[in-house]
């Protein structure tokens, strides 16, 4: 028995081109040899059919704008336990009317020319190629990118960093004012990206720093939590606002160092705001910036955006990270250039592609990126299923010395990715100078 479908029956305004349909049944499935011949759609093509546990995944190609389609899954196209034939199912859906060509306009007014060139390039290859990326091992380094080079012979296109130790910089162990590692990467032809695990005091005048919401004490895992309120963060006169203004002032100075060298930055702050609250009963918000809800979060995002604009920071390409069901957290098209999705522990390429298709349909006109990933399906299987990410970036493994056995993306995963002609390595990038 069919339990649910994605898209749902009667769904409208889906994107043209490719569509991944996922049907969830009430028992484990198998496919008969003639499965594909029993699944039809007039005016388009059923290109791939696969099953995994209770899910049947169907890749449809050749969808045109402004049309209504009916997918017919005939009786016996999928089999349940003991070979019992699943009954006939039909899923109706329609595609959106054709829109004008997307405009590669950054949300930052008068952007740095190099930032605009990067964004133009992302638009020009979107849907045809995907940029590879690697995350720094905690601090200012390209350790993981070097491991990718050792394993595959190629550097990833983007080196990502994290300003999580902003509160401590400059120090003898971390100094974001020393941009040599970023500048060297840029000078070698690569792109730069950065996130910000925004650590704040655990309480007013506190000396412990964290981004985990709580009562200001250690949690059951032994990690500090903070009472820092996102609602107060944008309100003058609060201690939270004083921290925010000081941190943004400090961050603006570090961003300006890159800007002064004409280095654009793919900027991904305030990520994963909704946590998994929309995914599971009893789900949690992971970071303080999402703890007070969507309205407080959006005010904080726009506050940061306007703060940097007033400081003359114009080298940023703004990436907002969705949790797929959190559209109320979206800051708005005027404040976002790319929509990212962080996916972990999902080895089914079609399931990843289904998330991509859903995000692309929800935030039309914005490139969609796999902004973080770990232990996911190979890039080739995701691509074949229709996931045309703008870029991808596996998370780092602390102090990894090689990719064999890497917890997020091992040697085989990276070799698969970097062997594909649609995956852009650093050596494939044009000059943006």
Where are these regions (language model features)?
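Aromatic-lined carbohydrate-recognition surfaces of secreted/lumenal glycan-active proteins
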Residues: 134-135, 268-271, 301-327, 366-376
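Substrate-binding cleft of secreted/luminal carbohydrate-active enzymes
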Residues: 130-136, 366-433
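Short, surface-exposed alpha-helix to beta-strand junction/turn motifs within ectodomains of secreted
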Residues: 17-50, 76-79
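N-terminal module-boundary/linker segments of secreted carbohydrate-active enzymes
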Residues: 96-164, 168-176, 183, 380-381, ...
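Acidic, Ser/Thr/Gly/Pro-rich low-complexity segments and short DxT(G/T)-type signature motifs
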Residues: 1-11, 75-100
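Substrate-binding cleft of extracellular glycoside hydrolase catalytic domains
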Residues: 168-303, 310-313
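Aromatic- and acid-rich polysaccharide-binding/catalytic face
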Residues: 161, 326-349, 393-395
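Short, solvent-exposed loop/linker segments at the N-terminal edge
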Residues: 11-17
């Amino acid at each position: 028995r069919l339990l649910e479908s994605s898209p749902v029956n009667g769904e409208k305004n889906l994107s043209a081109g490719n569509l991944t349909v996922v049907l969830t049944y009430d028992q484990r499935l198998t496919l008969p040899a003639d499965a594909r011949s029993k699944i039809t759609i007039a005016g388009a093509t059923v290109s791939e059919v696969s099953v995994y546990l209770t899910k049947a995944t169907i890749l449809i190609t050749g969808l045109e704008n402004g049309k209504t389609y009916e997918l017919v899954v005939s009786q016996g196209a999928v089999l349940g336990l003991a070979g019992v034939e699943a009954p006939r199912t039909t899923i109706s859906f329609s595609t959106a009317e054709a829109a004008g060509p997307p405009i590669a306009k950054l949300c930052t007014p008068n952007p740095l020319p190099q930032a605009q060139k990067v964004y133009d390039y992302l638009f020009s290859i979107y849907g045809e190629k995907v940029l590879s990326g690697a995350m720094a091992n905690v601090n200012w380094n390209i350790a993981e990118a070097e491991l990718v080079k050792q394993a595959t012979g190629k550097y990833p296109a983007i080196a990502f960093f994290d300003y999580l130790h902003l509160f401590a910089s400059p120090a003898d162990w971390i100094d974001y004012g020393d941009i040599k590692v970023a500048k060297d990467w840029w000078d070698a032809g690569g792109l730069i990206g950065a996130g910000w695990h925004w650590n704040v005091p655990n309480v007013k005048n506190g000396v412990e720093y964290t981004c985990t919401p709580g009562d200001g004490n250690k949690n059951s895992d032994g990690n500090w939590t903070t009472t820092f309120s996102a609602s107060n963060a944008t309100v003058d006169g609060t201690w939270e606002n004083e921290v925010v203004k000081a941190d943004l002032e400090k961050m603006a100075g570090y961003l300006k160092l890159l800007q002064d060298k004409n280095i654009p930055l793919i900027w991904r702050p305030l990520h994963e705001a909704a946590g998994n609250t929309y995914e599971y009963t009893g789900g949690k918000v992971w970071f303080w910036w999402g703890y007070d809800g969507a309205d407080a979060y959006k005010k904080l995002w726009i506050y940061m955006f306007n703060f940097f604009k007033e400081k003359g920071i114009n080298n940023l390409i703004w990436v907002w990270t969705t949790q797929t069901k959190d559209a109320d957290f979206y800051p708005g098209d005027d404040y976002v250039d790319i929509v990212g999705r962080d996916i972990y522990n999902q080895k089914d390429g079609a399931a990843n592609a289904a998330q991509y298709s859903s995000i692309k349909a929800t935030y039309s006109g914005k490139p969609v990126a796999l902004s973080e990933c770990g232990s996911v399906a190979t890039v080739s299987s995701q691509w074949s299923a229709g996931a045309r990410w703008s870029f991808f970036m596996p998370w780092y493994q602390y102090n990894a010395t090689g990719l064999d056995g890497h917890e997020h993306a091992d040697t085989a995963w990276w070799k698969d990715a970097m062997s594909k002609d649609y995956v852009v390595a650093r050596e494939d990038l044009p000059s943006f100078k």
